[in-house]
Each structure stands twice: as structure tokens, then as C-alpha cells.
Amino acid sequence: MENYTAPEWSRSALITIDTQCDTLDGQPFEIAGTTAILPRMKSLLAAFRSTGRPIIHIVRIYRADGSNVDLCRKELVQKGARLVLAGSPGCQLAPDLLPHDEILLDEGLLLSHGIQTIGDNEVVIYKPRWGAFYNTPLEQYLGKLEISTLVFCGCNFPNCPRTSIYEASERDFRVVLADDAVSGLYDQGRVEMRNIGVELLSASQVSAAVRR
């Protein structure tokens, strides 16, 4: 019998979520555990780059006037909180994620829902809300590449990774969560992911599978 949720590694892509400078230790929007997962995220990126598999970095970018900010954070930003603000260093991808130095986000392109290429088969997409698929070109991009399997890693499982995984599941993607390369993961979250067919693997297990 076919396992409909088993990863198809030859048709897989890696998705990093919101791993931007402001989320790292000591920064204005610090998310506990995000700096600690960077080495394992780097290992995943190395595996996907070495095999030519697609990589998509999903980011948040807030305008300083708060015009594109979620309602739950709008007042915070309008009062001067510096959270992944357009034009700020904190908005940039964490340096450990970059394929080479001196890459800066093209905020104009991204905010207009364009796709920024930063390497071979490696792009950045802006998402305006929690989910990576909501009002973004992600699904169309993955469809053109005939991707069936998505590997998720990155910042703050309860919010954006979790939402993005549910969105991927409802679009019938096979989903893998690199459970030691995502911050904020908790025991009940693991149970809930398995309950919807998500495969939980370590970064080293994913890397080995991609390289086979």
C-alpha cells in the first residue's frame, strides 16, 4: 500500500521561516532558541545546495508606518518598536543562512510579491501574515518546480512554521519538520504534527536522505 505522506526526496524543497537578524539572541525581536538552531539550519542548507534542491527563505518585512503589520502588532510598531522593519539591519536574513556574503533583501521587490533569487535554486519570498502560502507566490513557484515534499525549519514553531505546515498539508504536500532546526517546538506540537501526517526528522536525518 502506498504511503501518501512519505517524503519524496527527489522532489523536495527546503523552506526556512522568518530566520532574520531581529530574531537572534540579544536583538529587539529575540525568539528564544533561534540562534541555537542556526548550525543545524546551516547543515540542511548545505545538503540542499550540494544536491541542487530548491531552497525558499520566507521572511517578514514591516513598513515603519505599520501599514502592512498584523493587527496584533500594529500598535507596537506604530509606537516605535523595531521589528523586522524595512530598511533596518534586523530585517535581513541571518548571515548563517546566506549562500554567500553581501546579499541584501530587495525589499521593494519582495513587498510587491516578487521573488528574489539569491543563489542557484535559492530564493526569498515575503509573506504578509503567519502562513507562507497566504497571499504569496509560493504555491505557484513550487508547482512550476513539480515539488511534492516540503522540509520546514526556522523561527518560532507556534506561529509561522506551524501555520505554514498546516497550509502545506491542506494543499496535499508531503511535509517534513526538521525538529531540531526549529525554535519553539513543544511536545504537544510534535503530537499534533504527527497527527496530520508530518514526518519529524532531525537535520542530520534529512541531510542524509537528501544526499542519497
What are these regions (language model features)?
Residues 27-34:
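Short glycine-enriched, charge-decorated loop/helix-capping segments at active-site entrances
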Residues 149-158, 172-187:
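A short glycine-rich beta-strand->turn/loop micro-motif centered on a GG-aromatic cluster
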Residues 161-171:
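Short Gly/Thr/Asp-enriched flexible loops that form oxyanion-binding sites at enzyme active sites
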Residues 1-13, 42-50:
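Short amphipathic alpha-helices and their capping/turn segments at secondary-structure boundaries
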Residues 184-199:
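Active-site-proximal loop->helix
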Residues 200-212:
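A charged, well-structured terminal subsegment
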Residues 39-145:
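Active-site alpha/beta core segments
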